[in-house]
Every structure is written in structure tokens, then in C-alpha cells.
């Protein structure tokens, strides 16, 4: 693991009065970019590892579950330092050009997928930052946008440093009285990618099958959980922690508080991502959704993100039987949005 896995330490980026930033833009622009530049990456150490003494093998202790989940995830990753370097070079050679716009489209290769390597210390964030900054052939706006995403990582770590209970407590304490629902059936449907809302289900299946989820999809699925289903963000944080290969206390907790509206610089609670229009905008040809929801592959694009609106003849032609081959929606998107906004209004008015 990297001893220091941040570009700036939290205590190095504070406001003039010595208090921590609570909003990302001034944190990054006035704090990070105005501070001393991140140090250059250090060369890899030359360490001779001693041969360990013989001992009982881990397998003999029967500590691991019988089902090897890692076996399913492994084909999607080149694990280790060499894999991290290869991933970085592939991103610099192809993915980062067009990053500003392409990073929101899950079927395109415009995200770095370096977060697992950063989390496990297989590459340093300094190496990634300087590799992007020093690559003279890259569009400046794409590099700046990518580096600002590394800045969000710094912001999350700063929030955790100054708020060590970030994983457990709302940063905005008014949300302590929010009217969350408890429904194990809805939670299981969300976890399994069986909500009947294809763009959400595709993302949840990507998570289960690969240990990863595109950032746009993390926002869409998070919004669906805490707003349409109105289940506590703790449930989402715990599931992502269990399933993501890049699971990180700071990023995971801060991101869930952001989407729930109870965190620092949070998305307002009344901003509810519509998974139908999100799919139509960011997965126009349906490549991502069809990859992870193959039972819907033959649906026309017009109905792919809302199959419950398709005429029976269209469903029959695509081999889709709602409630059998693919679930009906677990909630009505319009009504559940209105219910969420009503719950927030009660909180704001102190009527909860």
C-alpha cells in the first residue's frame, strides 16, 4: 500500500481562517491548486523480499467462503502494479482525449478505471496526476477535467479526516429525522438488479459481475435507492462497500451522502435522477443496457429504458414478458419522486 495516497494532506488545504472547506469548488481551486504542486512520483523501491517460513496455508484454515467471487471478477482486471501501469497508459493513449464529454457515457472508454489500482496502492495518485499533466499531446480541457476528478477524491479524504464519523452520521444533521422507509424486498430488488428499471438494473448487474460501476451509474442507482425507493443511504453505502473493488471509506461515504443530499456540497434532495431520461441521454444506442440486461436486447431503443410503456406486440416480438422474463417496475417513477419530495418538504418544515 502507498504510505501517502493523496496529492495534498487534509491539513495542507484549509481556508484562511484555518477551518476545512465544505464546498468542492473553492476546496479545489483556492485550496488545492493554490497550494504547492503535488510532488513528483517516487521511483519504485528495490526491495528484496525474504522467503517466508513454512506455515499453515490460508486455504487450510477455511477462512474464505466456498464460493470464490473473485474468480468471477478477475477476468475484468489486470491486478498488480504492471496492470495499473498498463491501465494508465491505455487511458492516456486513448481514453482521456474526449474525457470531458465522454466520461458520462458508460459504454465508452473515457473513464480511467484506475480507482481500484489507486485504492490498493498499485499506483500512486501522484503518478497518475503527473502522467496526465505532463502528456503534452492531450487536450487541456480533458486533462483539467480529469484532474478535477482526482480533486474530488482529495475532497472526500478531507471530509473524512475532519469528520471521522462520515460513514455513520449525516453531515447535515437535519437529515437525522428524515422519513426513510424500511423494505427488505425493495432493497433486494435493487441489489440484484431486478427493479424493473433497465438503466438501474444494468448498473447493479455491472457492479455484481465486475466489481465496478461507472460513475454516472453510481449517481443514477444512488438516486433511485434514496429517492425513488426512499431507503436509507446506509444501505447503499454498505452494498457498495461489499461489492466495489475500489471501495474506499472516504469516497464511498462522501458520495452516498452527496447523492442523498445530507453531505457536504451535496446534490439538493429535490434533484432526482430520472433513470429513463438518463438512459436515453447517456446510453443512446442502448449498448450498455443491453450488455447487462440481455433479456431486453431485442427491444427497440424507443422502449428499452421503459419497457412497461411498450405495446404488447412489441414486447412479444422482443421475447419480453413483464413479470416473467423481466420484472415490472417496483415503483412508479413519477409517484415515487413526488413522495420523496413530499418527505423532504415535511423535513424542511419540521413536521416529521
Residue ranges of model-derived segments:
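Glycine-rich, charge-decorated loop segments at or immediately adjacent to ligand/cofactor-binding or catalytic sites
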Residues: 6-17
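Short, solvent-exposed loop/turn segments at secondary-structure junctions
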Residues: 6-7, 29, 226
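Active-site-proximal binding-pocket segments
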Residues: 109-301
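Glycine/tryptophan-enriched, flexible segments
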Residues: 18-174, 282-283, 287-352
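Conserved small/polar residues in nucleotide/adenosyl-binding loops
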Residues: 1-5
Amino acid at each position: 500500500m502507498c504510505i501517502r495516497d493523496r496529492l495534498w494532506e487534509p491539513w495542507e488545504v484549509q481556508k484562511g481562517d484555518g477551518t476545512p472547506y465544505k464546498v468542492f469548488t473553492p476546496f479545489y481551486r483556492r485550496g488545492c491548486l493554490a497550494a504547492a504542486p503535488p510532488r513528483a512520483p517516487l521511483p519504485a523501491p528495490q526491495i528484496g523480499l525474504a522467503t517466508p517460513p513454512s506455515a499453515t496455508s490460508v486455504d487450510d484454515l477455511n477462512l474464505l467462503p466456498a464460493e470464490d467471487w473473485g474468480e468471477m471478477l478477475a477476468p475484468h482486471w489486470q491486478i498488480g502494479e504492471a496492470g495499473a501501469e498498463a491501465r494508465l497508459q491505455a487511458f492516456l493513449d486513448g481514453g482521456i482525449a474526449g474525457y470531458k464529454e465522454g466520461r458520462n457515457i458508460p459504454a465508452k472508454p473515457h473513464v480511467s478505471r484506475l480507482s481500484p489500482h489507486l485504492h490498493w496502492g498499485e499506483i500512486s495518485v501522484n503518478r497518475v496526476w503527473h502522467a496526465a499533466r505532463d502528456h503534452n499531446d492531450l487536450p487541456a480541457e480533458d486533462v483539467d477535467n480529469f484532474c478535477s476528478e482526482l480533486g474530488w477524491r482529495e475532497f472526500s479524504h478531507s471530509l473524512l479526516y475532519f469528520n471521522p464519523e462520515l460513514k455513520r452520521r449525516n453531515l447535515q444533521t437535519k437529515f437525522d429525522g428524515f422519513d426513510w422507509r424500511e423494505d427488505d424486498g425493495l432493497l433486494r430488488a435493487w441489489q440484484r438488479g431486478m427493479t424493473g428499471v433497465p438503466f438501474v438494473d444494468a448498473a447493479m448487474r455491472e457492479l455484481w459481475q465486475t466489481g465496478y460501476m461507472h460513475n454516472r451509474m453510481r449517481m443514477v442507482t444512488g438516486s433511485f435507492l434514496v429517492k425513488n425507493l426512499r431507503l436509507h443511504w446506509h444501505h447503499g453505502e454498505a452494498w457498495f462497500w461489499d461489492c466495489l473493488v475500489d471501495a474506499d471509506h472516504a469516497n464511498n461515504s462522501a458520495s452516498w451522502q452527496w447523492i442523498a443530499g445530507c453531505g457536504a456540497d451535496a446534490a439538493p434532495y429535490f434533484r432526482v435522477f430520472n433513470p429513463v431520461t438518463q438512459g436515453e441521454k447517456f446510453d443512446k444506442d442502448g449498448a450498455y443496457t443491453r450488455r447487462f440486461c440481455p433479456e431486453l436486447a431485442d427491444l427497440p431503443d424507443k422502449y428499452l429504458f421503459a419497457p412497461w410503456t411498450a405495446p404488447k406486440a412489441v414486447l412479444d416480438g422482443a421475447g419480453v414478458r413483464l413479470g416473467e422474463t423481466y420484472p415490472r417496475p417496483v415503483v412508479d417513477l413519477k409517484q415515487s419522486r413526488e413522495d420523496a419530495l413530499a418527505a423532504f418538504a415535511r423535513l424542511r418544515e419540521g413536521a416529521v
